[in-house]
Amino acid sequence: MLVLLCCVVLHVGVARICCSHEPKWQLVWSDEFTNGISSDWEFEMGNGLNGWGNNELQYYRRENAQVEGGKLVITAKREDYDGFKYTSARLKTQFDKSWKYGKIEAKMAIPSFRGVWVMFWMSGDNTNYVRWPSSGEIDFIEHRNTNNEKVRGTIHWSTPDGAHAHHNRESNTNGIDYHIYSVEWNSSIVKWFVNGNQYFEVKIQGGVNGKSAFRNKVFVILNMAIGGNWPGFDVADEAFPAKMYIDYVRVYQDASTSSPVGDTSLDGYYFVQNRHSELYLDVTDASNEDGAFLQQWSYSGNENQQFDFEHLENNVYKITNKKSGKSLDVYNFGTENGVRIQQWSYGGARNQQFTVQSVGDGYYKIIPRGSGKLVEVADFSKDAGGKIQQWSDNNQLSGQWKLIKSKSYSKLIQAESYFDSSKVQLEDTSDVGGGKNVKCDNEGAWMAYKDIDFPSSGNYRIEYRVASERAGGKLSLDLNAGSIVLGMLDVPSTGGWQKWTTISHTVNVDSGTYNLGIYVQRASWNINWIKITKIPEQSNLNQGRRNSKLIQAESYFSYSEVQLEDTLDVGGGKNVKCDKEGAWMAYKDIDFPSSGSYRVEYRVASERAGGKLSLDLNAGSIVLGMLDIPSTGGLQKWTTISHIVNVDLGTYNLGIYVQKASWNINWIRITKV
């Protein structure tokens, strides 16, 4: 039986006049801290950019968060560390757990003294791309200084003209004692509670006044800051050590509505691979704009090839591109065969909702709710750039898709957020997002970034946002003051000191937390940001080609005397230049799942005949064979050559050796024969 409550609604307030159903809360996630700190939490370390944007005084460390007696304890200390007077801790569920709508709560007891700033809050999942406050922020509770009879709930967002807007209200609550702080949130309204008693609400229905940010997924953050713009800079040193106790954090969703509980088995981020072509669903030109069409493309690992499947009701999903935040959309609400699939800001129409139907072997049909047709690759194309459209369901393989789970990690570092530097300068940038860029016009200059986390071992794509008036610049990337050199990259001419482009290379890093360094090998150039993205394992991304593994040539973990350059081959990215005899590349932990024959293909280009490569395992201890490289008519005219080799079952480091130069290589594919 549906229970209706009558109530009075103001834009901001507590009194209400509407009718709504009583939520039936179902627990979907929690951390009770009975078995330590869950792996769903990620620690943020350091002092952030400009003191986390607030000129805060503390340095965040992992060591300042521990479990004591079944409770998470964040301890702020008066201790000198890396140039800061205070340490504390900050945890978030970003990259691991995020939710859209529901009830989020924590049972907490917090300290109260001059200079403290305690927060339990949430931020939009897209914060790395749109920046604050456009990503939206809801503070379940924040408390500052010695006002121990008050806690505050706040909401921050960006208005349509880009201005920062916020509302807040205080609750008469003594935070030193344990209380349950909750927020209930749906597509229409956000409500704040202490111990089940509501004290604040804000209407967000229809994205009014720019509040559409609160209709996206969010992640949760816990932290205790010391000092800053809001609490001030007068800190009571006698109050340390100070402890913030969290008994639990819980997330509920409403089981009495159609969204989002139900069959949510596909909820999450995926690479989407076509069964017929074995290429991947991709947003054309990696666009963030409404109206950009979908296409198929070679695997890149980028976020424009990752899609969030969010269950709405009865096997109906909203499908959102991770990079742009836009939803898959049937062009102009079309119902006919041949209508293109594009991306568009989500509005909840049936042309933006899809049923997902399993056909076995890990493949699915994706069916627009408004037309009942299949999302397919047009004309049975196997070419990169093939169009994505809707068509009648004839069980065509071009309309079947493998959903390959993405567990990507991405971190954006503002170039000016270094903790140490030499011979660099800051200046205002005209790049998107504004702020500052770093001027690198002295050879030997460098910047160091503290406590950069690489959560798992493997390949990472490192992107740099750069500008230069002339060619010839070069940077190098290292870890821990140069003890581990990851690679070098040429900085091209972009046509001006404020004409920006993004360059990248792939590096191999063991899991761990490092100080990351950028060194100016050759000046002059500017840099605005660095982005680190975990590249998912290729072995999990080539399931559409049975017993096949594709290796991007630039994904080596070690090398000698080769260089990277932009490629004109299908799929873009980088190729490796092999123009020195004796040069080599090594690829880590390549699996040969059974003994026998394997076809090894190489995507190569050369201006002249006479090139030769050799293939070996484990630093040359097993030589598998050699292969001549023909003239292809140019260093960006690509062809595929191959040979058959015999390999015993096992996992090896695979090497490619330049017997005779010069040639380029884009990828290697290994297929069990």
Curated annotation (Swiss-Prot):
Domain of life: Eukaryota
Keyword Cell wall biogenesis/degradation applies: no
Domain GH16 positions: 27-257
One cellular component (GO) term of this entry: serine-type endopeptidase complex
Catalytic residues as annotated in Swiss-Prot or TrEMBL: E137, E142
The enzyme's E.C. designation: 3.2.1.-
The Ricin B-type lectin domain, residue ranges: 266-404
Tissue localization of expression: Expressed in hemocytes (at protein level).
Principal EC category: hydrolase
Practical applications: Clotting factor G is a component of the Limulus test used to detect bacterial endotoxins in fluids.
Site feature (Cleavage) residues: R169, E170
Glycan-modified residues: N186
Record function comment: Component of the heterodimer clotting factor G which may play a role in defense mechanisms against fungi. Initiates a (1->3)-beta-glucan-sensing clotting pathway whereby the alpha subunit binds to glucans containing (1->3)-beta linkages, which are components of the fungal cell wall, and the beta subunit catalyzes the activation of proclotting enzyme.
Protein name: Clotting factor G alpha subunit
Organism name: Tachypleus tridentatus (Japanese horseshoe crab)
